[in-house]
Structure formats: C-alpha cells, structure tokens
A protein has these predicted regions:
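Acidic-aromatic/histidine active-site loop/patch
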Residues: 92
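Short, well-ordered alpha-helical microsegments
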Residues: 95-99
C-alpha cells in the first residue's frame, strides 16, 4: 500500500501533535484529498469519506464551541470511532479536551497547524 505516514505529514507540514502517545508511523494516508467535517458535526454521516484527513477550521471550531457538552461528546465519539486517519486543527486552534480523550481511545492522531 503506497502512501504517506502521519509522521511524514507532521514533519512536512510542521504540525504539532496533540496526541503524542499514538504511534503515527503505523498510520498510512492513502487518499490525497481532505475533508472538512461540517455535516458530520451535526450528526450526518451518510456518504462520509473516512479515508480522508479531517480538517477542523475556524467555522467548524466555532460550531463545536456552541454545542452542549453531552452532544459534543456524542459527536466526538462518532467521528473518532469511524476510523479516520487523523484530525488537523487549522490556525493554531486547540482541540477540546473531550475530543483528545476520544482521539486517544480510538487511536486517531490530533494535529494542529499554526497556519
């Protein structure tokens, strides 16, 4: 299987790893596209391409901040349990502690870009 490991992505894109306990050498990206999971944050997972890197941008983060904690935790559980390769937060935004809990549980690297 050809692809790029999450470790290579971290190094080439100068990302910070918020989940360093996850072995990113074992996760290989095989899909060149990315996804911004706006609809998935609302609970809609039909036609969700879980092979793509998931990007949490400013709009997605703003929406997450409006959610009640129990709803947010349910959404984080569903998103991270769907076997996505990783999550990337853009513009230096920090992931929620509850999200990091689920990322660690399901082995999903959570990365942060300063750009």
């Amino acid at each position: 299987m050809h692809g790029v490991t999450i470790t290579e992505l971290i190094e080439k894109m100068h990302l910070r790893n918020s989940t360093p306990q996850i072995d990113t050498d074992k996760i290989v990206l095989t899909h060149p596209d990315v996804n911004r999971p706006a609809l998935q944050l609302t609970g809609f997972f039909d036609h969700f391409d879980r092979e793509r890197v998931q990007i949490i941008g400013y709009v997605e983060q703003a929406y997450i901040k409006t959610m009640e904690r129990d709803v947010k935790r349910q959404m984080f559980d569903k998103l991270t349990s769907s076997q996505i390769p990783c999550l990337v937060f853009s513009r230096g935004q920090e992931p929620d502690d509850d999200l990091l809990e689920y990322c660690n549980y399901y082995g999903v690297p959570c990365l942060v870009s300063d750009k």
